[in-house]
A protein has these predicted regions:
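Surface/interface-facing alpha-helical segments and adjacent flexible terminal/loop regions used
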Residues: 171-172
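A short, acidic, amphipathic alpha-helical segment used as a generic capping/interface helix at domain edges
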Residues: 175-177
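RNA-binding basic/glycine-rich loop and surface signature characteristic of RAMP-family CRISPR effectors
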Residues: 1-159, 165, 179-250
């Protein structure tokens, strides 16, 4: 029986990292505009169905991917993650090279793409976040980060209204354009989960060793949020987006 491109593999959860996230500065997540009113805000951080702030998993995942991308440029960093990515790409190639899979033009192109990547010195650790054009690749999933509720806090206690000047040049003139933002206050606590799934279990001992090493490297990358260099959301150059992360399942 011939198999086609969209193979269905059962995903296996390799590890889970539960995270408590605390805002250290004001944070502006997403680009949620509110209905205009005199004295209203120009831009608001995203909110959930109950009106509380929310940090969408895609925003956190994108910020983490940026850290991994920056770290792997440094010698000796993210090496075990790269090794795991190489093992997985070889697993995918083995499956797609099998004789019972129809070699469509799309699959042939994908195989060539993977062969080039696995044999390249530029094999990237960030491929654990997914690879364009490749189905079934192991990847990181990130939940939304939701507020840790407190009986003492009302909806308004999570937000600040902040005004910053936006400098614009119009017809050779430098103009100051004040803009108002509804942002998350410093000190607001959120919780969320990162999970890593793979449809390709490799040899038990090798898999366990790589899993432990890769999780350790990912935790080290997450801890870099705490040094003040990396942040999340918009307007980081203006001081927004500073956070602190703690691991809840240590």
């Amino acid at each position: 029986m011939q198999k086609y491109f969209n193979l269905e593999w059962k995903e296996i959860e390799m590890f889970e990292i539960k995270i408590k996230l605390t805002t250290e500065s004001c944070c502006l997540i997403g680009n949620q505009t509110e209905s205009f009113s005199v004295g209203g805000v120009d831009q608001s951080t995203t909110i959930d169905e109950n009106g509380r702030p929310i940090i969408h998993g895609s925003a956190f995942k994108g910020a983490l991917r940026n850290i991994v991308r920056e770290q792997e440029k440094k010698e000796g960093q993210m090496e075990k993650t790269k090794e795991y990515v190489k093992c997985i790409i070889n697993e995918i190639l083995e499956k797609y090279r099998s004789e019972d899979i129809v070699k469509t033009e799309k699959i042939e192109k994908m195989i060539l793409n993977l062969e080039n990547k696995v044999n390249s010195k530029d094999l990237k650790a960030e491929y654990i976040f997914g690879m364009e054009g490749i189905n079934g690749l192991p990847r990181i999933f990130c939940s939304d980060f939701r507020v840790i509720e407190s009986k003492d806090k009302k909806i308004g206690d999570y937000f600040l209204i902040d005004t910053k000047n936006c400098i614009e040049e119009i017809n050779g003139n430098i103009l100051s354009n004040p803009r108002t933002y509804k942002v998350i206050k410093p000190g607001v606590e959120f919780e969320g989960v990162i999970r890593f799934y793979t449809p390709f279990p490799i040899a038990a001992k090798e898999a366990k060793e790589l899993e432990d090493s890769m999780e350790k490297e990912l935790r080290c990358a997450l801890e870099l949020f705490n040094n003040g260099i990396y942040g999340i959301g918009n307007s980081k150059s203006r001081g927004y987006g500073q956070i602190r992360v703690e691991f809840c399942n240590d």
